[in-house]
Amino acid sequence: MKGSIFRHPTPLPLGVSSGYVMTVLGPLPISEMGVTLMHEHILLDASGKWVPPCCCSDRHLAEMPVKMENLGELSLNPLMSRDNCQLFDVDVAIEELTKYRALGGETVVDPTNIGIGRDPNALARIARLTGLNIIMGTGLYLEPSHPEWVRTSSVEQLTERLIYDLGGAEEKPEVLAGLIGEIGISSRFTPDEEKSLRAAGRASAATGVPIEVHLPGWERLGHRVLDILEQEGADLRHTVLCHMNPSFADKRYQRELAQRGAFLEYDMIGMSYYYADESAQSPSDEENARAIRELIDDGYIQQILLSQDVFLKTMLTRYGGHGYGYILKH
């Protein structure tokens, strides 16, 4: 992997055991992370999730910018608007994150990765201007978002790419990733998604950097994912399983995953959308709170992570959404 040599600390602290986490502005002691959101997209191109309406009468909404007149329709089917799936504006990101900072937020983990609009230099600028610690992801999301070169790459080649992004190679990028993820797993769990997951496991084993895995929340693929990561040498205690909210009622499933060491991430807090592509409603905050309370009562408080997974314009306060500060405010 070719890159430029930049001035990073030598030796570069890598992985959980180093006591540091890598932000877009450099290493930060884990003890100084403070109030942290573990799963929020700052800049993102989620156009791959865009599903134009099938009804002729709704097709005008597909290319309409997000505005007051279509917020109601987008609450019922948020992915039918291409514009809603695009977070491109750095100034809007700064405005939204400044509100989170004012509420006491200190760190944001942004799992936007390769192929879905990751912008390292812009994230570094946003971190400087907001005063927030921003941790950037690496790896691959769902197969439709994979760059063409992924199809012909081996697990070894993908692993090498991730290690480079994390600063584990001799040559390093200017802005380093501090997380492997969010690694995309679909309900079809395609061969290329498995290849990507195996590379993530190997890169984590080599560097000690944690992994975040996007699970199809209404499915039950958690054990299969953990089995593969275990085969590749990853430490399951440094593995985050995302989108656990939809499986909140399956107590046995979630507790079995936690017993294997994984973190359970309830990252759909405040999300009230109906997802037409899943024919499913996001769990309510009451359902989330009850499930989290029961996990705490059962002794899993150290393995629960909370976030809101901001990834649409309609989730930003500028467009009538809760923004990044919902958990801290409510």
Predicted regions, residues:
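Alpha-helical scaffold segments that flank or form the walls of functional sites
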Residues: M38, L43, C54-T112, I116-T130, ...
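Active-site gating/metal-coordination segments in enzymes
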Residues: T107, R125-R128, N133-P210, F263
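Active-site beta-loop-alpha junctions enriched in small/polar residues
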Residues: H41-L43, N113-I114, G139-E143, E182-I185, ...
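Histidine/acidic-residue-rich catalytic or RNA/ligand-binding cores of hydrolases
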Residues: A46-G48, P120, L221-D227, D250-L257, ...
